[in-house]
């Protein structure tokens, strides 16, 4: 449950058990992990809480999954080579502070050892912290190994929130509780943009936290998911306020497993991209998760004052059906110096 301000009298007002309480100074909200009694109706409880505290959100502590797969074929390109067709080089990144909410990042990897990374764990419990997904995304964003590998923003500052754990009962997942706390940390650290390469069900608590984050001037970028073209929209990408990203290959063809829909905003490279692997190696990765950081870097650089982020839909390279469509959105993200210049 998420309520405005710093609420202290929740337990005395309702017949519930409070498992955890988090004061979120960045979002100016309070997050509760509560357990209702067996005879309580969650919808009725949510209504009662909303009547007492105002604009609140009550929902299950839903779980979210990462959205990328390793591939056995050789990589098509490095991040910078993949990004060349987006015009990404027209933007600087010196002042960029990137927020990454993902798995734990292997900071011992040669591509990340000397990167400016501040990492914090937000997982409740003792489950194993997976490394693969977050390490890959971090390398695409800020990785650099002399002569071997360079990410999109090697001079940027990365704030990496570890929110995933690996449990036998649920696999590799992140809870809403962890995600909301991570969003609060990002607001506290005044990041320029947040990358959410994950997907799952709708959740009113997560949506409220994302809306408050965006109200603080921080764009949120999310992958649309890899459940296939016939799948229902996945969240958080399907929230109207979030920039939803799909993946295309080196020939600008949509990734065959990408979710489609009217919520889609932009396409970006996301098929067989070279990325770091835990332990020091590199390998090709594919998925809408991999496409998201290409959009994240462009929005982050634009949010430092170089270019208004809202203009990127206008300067995207149209793909597929002319105009907006449910496969590519507005098209391949492109940084044009003036609208229409590509």
Tell me the role of every PLM-derived stretch.
Residues 88-98, 104-118, 125-176, 239-240, ...:
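Subtilisin-like serine protease catalytic core
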Residues 1-67, 193, 340:
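Inhibitory N-terminal propeptides of secreted protease zymogens
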Residues 164-240, 251-254, 260, 278-292, ...:
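Substrate-binding/access-modulating region of protease and related hydrolase catalytic domains
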Residues 54-56, 94-97, 155-158, 188-194, ...:
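Loop/turn elements at helix/coil->beta-strand transitions in domains of secreted/extracellular proteins
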Residues 101, 110-112, 117-119, 247-289, ...:
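Catalytic-core environment of secreted peptidases
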Residues 59, 123, 159, 219-222, ...:
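Structural detector of well-ordered beta-strand residues that form the stable sheet scaffold
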Residues 141, 161-163, 270-342:
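Hydrolase catalytic cores
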Residues 40, 44, 50-105, 109-113, ...:
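Protease zymogen maturation seam
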């Amino acid at each position: 449950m998420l309520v405005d301000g710093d609420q202290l009298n929740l337990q005395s007002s309702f017949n519930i058990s409070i498992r955890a309480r988090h004061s979120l100074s960045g979002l100016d909200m309070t997050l509760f992990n509560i357990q209702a009694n067996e005879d309580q109706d969650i919808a009725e409880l949510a209504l009662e809480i909303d009547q007492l505290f105002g604009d609140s959100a009550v929902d299950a502590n839903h779980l979210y999954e990462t959205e990328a797969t390793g591939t056995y074929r050789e990589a098509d390109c490095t991040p910078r080579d993949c990004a060349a067709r987006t015009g990404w080089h027209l933007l600087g990144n010196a002042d960029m502070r990137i927020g990454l909410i993902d798995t734990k990042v292997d900071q011992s990897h040669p591509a990340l050892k000397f990167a400016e990374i501040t990492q914090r764990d937000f997982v409740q419990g003792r489950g194993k912290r997976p490394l693969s997904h977050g390490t890959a995304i971090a390398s695409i964003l800020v990785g650099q190994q002399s002569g071997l590998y360079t990410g999109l923003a090697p001079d940027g500052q990365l704030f990496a929130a570890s929110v995933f754990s690996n449990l036998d009962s649920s696999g590799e997942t992140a809870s809403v509780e962890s995600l909301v706390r991570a969003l609060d940390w990002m607001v506290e650290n005044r990041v320029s943009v947040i990358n959410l390469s994950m997907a799952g069900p709708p959740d009113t608590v997560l949506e409220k936290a994302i809306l408050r984050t965006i109200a603080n001037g921080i764009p949120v970028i999310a992958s649309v998911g890899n459940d296939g073209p016939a799948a229902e929209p996945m969240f958080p990408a399907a929230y109207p306020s979030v920039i939803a990203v799909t993946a295309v290959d080196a020939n600008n063809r949509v990734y065959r497993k990408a979710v489609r829909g009217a919520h889609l905003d932009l396409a970006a490279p996301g098929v067989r991209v070279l990325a770091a692997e835990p332990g020091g190696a590199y390998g090709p990765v594919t998925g809408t998760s991999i496409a998201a950081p290409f959009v994240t870097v462009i929005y982050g650089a634009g949010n430092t004052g170089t270019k208004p982020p809202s203009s990127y839909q206008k300067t995207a390279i149209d793909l597929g059906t002319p105009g907006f469509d449910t496969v590519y959105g507005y098209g391949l993200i492109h940084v044009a110096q003036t609208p229409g210049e590509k």
